[in-house]
């Protein structure tokens, strides 16, 4: 049983589709967000104003919207019930700014409605955090000590895979909600709706790439473990 096999064996070929998709997704989200950061939305509303309007309309006036440093550091915190927007999104009036702001509000609406995939994902976060940090240590122990450790590491790594897969419906649903809110509240017109969809679709592709990478890595690890049995 040799640790270099984790990197140099033929099963590495399984990861090539995920690597290529990840590269494409990274390029796509970067180029698309940059492109539409330069396109001003017709209404001239900032990301903060859009978020506030969507939240208030959906009975979430108690949820604060705050600026945070960094680029595309936007997120919704279900524990703190807070929408955090990067400064470029918070103060910006671009298509990207209002689209990202609406997407994070989509998560807030999911939280209010106890959207099942989001509830499940939040529930497994502590376990996933532990598993993601411990799995590779135990997997490497499996190569040096005993294959039983390898299978234990694979079991822990599977928690990360589950998290990545469950993230997909959460993110796609949040984007769907965002587009509906932008349209129903009259924040965007028909052409802008299409542009917003491009921004959110590009962002969603990164989650697809991450999920595919995790699944293929899990399959690869299982094949390596079986070959050492």
Task: Set out the residue ranges of the language-model regions.
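Hydrophobic alpha-helical transmembrane segments of small proteolipidic membrane proteins, enriched
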Residues: 2-32, 142, 152-154, 162-165
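Membrane-interfacial helix-loop-helix connectors in multipass membrane proteins
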Residues: 141-155, 224-229
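Membrane-helix exit/interface motif
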Residues: 110-116, 138-148
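Core segments of transmembrane alpha-helices
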Residues: 130-139, 213
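Short His/Asp/Glu-rich catalytic/ion-coordination signatures at enzyme active sites or charged loops
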Residues: 159
